[in-house]
């Protein structure tokens, strides 16, 4: 997230380690100096996006943090996708709302994009997170791929540290986001995991 104290340092470290850096962009109802809100003019939205990109060096892509109100705004999402395309970036729709038009706007201009299938940690218990990971594994077997979103909560990290080494035995390969975009051919999976 661009407004966190160590965003730039973490982005540099991730880039140095060969990881894909993404901006986790705050969107309404999220607040803060970078957050996009429906009442803002395009110039303000673009200014906040540019500031966020400066705050997170090496960003190759962007996804929405919260954004249930913002991602349902067609004009703002078209503006965002056009700007990301000009920067050669990709977009991952966190799908915080069933009314989102973000992925559709990305796809309409051919912007590399994905949509989330499973949230790992809406409920922050080890048991619930492990259950969501099992749901994701089942979905991956059913539809071929699955996009998972989680947070660096201690419970999430505990589950991932325990379970990631076991994925291959379960017939699942953990792949980078750019590879997933290639696997899905820039098309959203039917019903986005529902």
Annotate each PLM feature:
Residues 1-194:
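Catalytic-site microenvironment of enzymes
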